[in-house]
Amino acid sequence: MSPAPARDGPPRFDLPYRLFGRARGVATGGHKALGQGANGAFLRHASLLEQPDARRIDMRASLLDPFGGLKVRRFEHRARIDVFVVLDLSGSMSFRRDGQGEDPVADLCAAIAHAAIRSHDRFGLIAAGPEPLAELGVRATARRGVPDELWRRLSAEPGAGRGSRGLLAAVEELPQRRALVFVVSDFLMPQAEIEDLLGALWRHDVAPVVVRSSAVEAPPPRFGLLETRDLETGRRRLLVMRPSLREKWIAHARARRAALDESFRRFGRPAFDLVDRFDADAFADHLLTGGA
Amino acid sequence: MRRPDWRTVALGAALALGVVAALQPETEAERPTYDVVAFVDITGSMNARDYRDASGRPQSRLEAVKTRLSTAVGRLPCGSKMGLGVFTERRVFLLFEPMDICRNYGAIAGAIAGLDWRMGWEGDSRVASAVFAALDMLAPMNADIVFLTDGQEAPPMRTDMPLEYSGDKDKVKGLLVGVGGTELVPIPKHDDFGRETGFYAMEDVPQASRLGPPPTGAENLPGYNARNAPFGEMPAGEEHLTSVRESYLGDLGRMTGLGYARLDQPDALAQAIAANARPRPVPVAVDLSPLPAAAALLALVALYGVPPLARLGRRRAPTHASRSFN
Amino acid sequence: MTGLGFDHPWALLLLPLALLPFLVSPLRLSGVPSAEVAPEDTLSRAVGAGIVALGALAIVLLVLGLSGLHRRDHVVERTGVGANIVLLIDRSSSMDSTFANRRPDGAEESKSVAARRLLTDFAARRPADRVAVAAFSTAPMLVIPMTDKHDAVRAAIGAIDRPGLAHTDVGRGLSLAFSMFDETSTETSRAIVLVSDGAAVIDRRVQDALRAAAARDPVRLYWLFLRTAGARGITDRPPPGDPDSPQTYPERHLDIFFKTLGLPYRSFEARSAGEVSDAIREIDQLEQRPTLYSETIPRQDLDWLCYWAAAGALLLLLAAKLSERRLEDWEGEALLPSPLRGGVGGGGGAGEGATRIVASRRRALHSAPPPTLALPRKGGGNAPDVHSQQPDSGRAAS
């Protein structure tokens, strides 16, 4: 099968995401679920009396049974899950997302949507800045057009406002059933707020995605005056760039990232770093090794 | 290198303009200055109180002259000179010659404040003669005249003998300043010790001139007596009351080539002096530095002021643009 | 005292403009997701405050310059050697004749002209003096109050050769002179110089007043008597038999009266301009006492100083502006390793099929459907299908 033409963002690929633990739900899908099903990975043998399914009689096992009972193969149930993206669209997320160049966030969300729908899961999105952005949200759906549409909408929505308190309110709308939730944010909020958010998502399998920009983590090496403006608060800061400050700056960024990692580990998974641009391979690697 | 930021340009411009301002560019200009001698009438009628001071209390004409004249000369451009004289009887008495007002303002103001009717050496008030005398005095000094008087001739002028001025009308310029109100007011009377003892009554002052030969036809006047009363008996009159004689002073001014102004607020007096005295241009350096300094300030204000204004405009305009998708 | 003044104080209304630098930066700002991305830095904070201050300072200085800041002319008290002198000058008409009692002609100057000339010299020689000038004739006249402006003194002395008035009222002139010393003139240095060419009877009441004034304000009194040829002198005594009354010998009796005042008193009788000059020189030598006099320091414009300082501030600002850096010009440097790529990962076990996908490259990844894909509904995930749904997708999603 050929990839979708890149009319709405970069080409999209399937992603090997996985839900930690077993999914619940009756709708058939691609994820290990609670219960037994008729298809998929072998689980155990059962007696035909217990499970009168003549089509799945395991002849070999029946013959090897010293008691001569007829054995029926039981399989794991595989269920469909909901894949959600909880997207922080506060002002800080507008950094380098002016709709001109690449938009890694839109790329990532569209890629997740694409992959989820391709995997016969449902995809949904919850976006919030300081207030929940209901009109940007996507209800759990398997509709095919969603990735492209989402990509276009997110590209046009740089994010605004101060703080991401809206996220906490918005995650209430997630389904009760355990879902895979990608929390996409720069996590440049107070540690307590991060933990509140992660705590509110206890029911779900949370996969954080940290949106980072190497430009602000490692400043330009030249001497000079750099005046920064906080995209959320508008606060200005003047910085006298020099090697010692640059080193301090990098160390500062490292420390912040390490603290973040600490939180994420406490709440489950390590985070994926979306640095500068969306690298589908790296994301796939991440999902395989550390994530779902 | 990229095109520099406009703010860099604004800063550079402000810097350059600031340096230009600091170098104090100058241009030469001429400023009119005046050289005047003020003569103040200190005769008795100047004690009449028909002015009001700043707090609204009645003020004598002489006091009004003193406060307003010293303020007015302070308004004359620097480099102007002023002398001071007093007038009673038929002559003027020069207290000091013209001196630079700006440098000696304290002394001038002190001298003006020291004017007193007690300086008067005689009670008569021959305004026209004194003006002529003052003009004679000033002609060799090349100074202009400011003659402050109420115009009250005491004793009154002969109505049948027209006044004539024989001097040169253009030698001395300047103005007569009429002091007093247009309403008739009584004149305070003082005793030998200078204490005020009431007001002059009609009988206290001559109501008509008795100078010179009697006019023709005086025989027909009431009370005529060839030896004892060649002018007839003293007619009733209002010479014991006083008001500013504006028309008389105006005529006197026209006769002598002087202007006339009523004593009003100091600014008006300074303007009247400037309008009537001969301006003597002196070269002065005019500092041009405010121009580049103002431009530098403008550049700085633009540097700091335009971004917030632009932001304000941007915020107002595109409310629909950010949500255009929905 | 020393004070600052403004030529155009209304221009100070522009001072609030100096608040602008606190609100706006001359540098181009670089948006960052959060102010916390940069570490705290004391130097940076100081420089930031400095740039704000420089901007405000430049505006304040320009406004101050525009409003014509200057140091007002002020008076400095100095001590010098001189005196506080009241020149009491006779301006009776007799002063207009010469010492020989003739009408002045080209050869001989009148007494008033000589007095004017010599007194002008006298005042010019003594810069530390404070001088007041009074004239007397029929009435006493204050000419110039006590001043250290020698211009003013010269102008006042300059007027004494104008035609004078009839009488000589010495007594009231003197009492005016006594009243002209102000508080700033130190008591020890007060002197009255009476210049006259005659004397007159002093009214008894005025005599009493003068005695009281002399007791109250001790001054030194000098009488410079310009004696006209043929007139009586100070020391002339009446021949025996003649009545010795103030009416007939006013000069002698005035001298006697002065001596009774109890003041340091000297009289000088001058019969010619030369003698006047000698007398004045003697007074000059006698009146050498410490005095407080004031000197006026003329106003100093300070606007040029403001402009230079503003230019200095602007130069620093420009230097700051020229060393401006922006994040926008900077692509960044991936110095920070992703914690996961650094080998931290591997927390979850690999599910089935995982190894296959890890091994596959991108091309393989997107061409292979997930291995455990359940039966596709509605014909599976074909790309054309995706795009055919686009027209109504927006509506469906919102």
What do the PLM-derived regions correspond to, one by one?
Chain B
Residues 151-244:
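VWA/integrin I-like adhesion module and closely mimicked acidic/polar interface patches used
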Residues 35-39, 254-292:
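Juxtamembrane amphipathic/hinge helix adjacent to a transmembrane helix
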Residues 1-31, 275-326:
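C-terminal signal-anchor/stop-transfer transmembrane helix together with its immediate cytosolic
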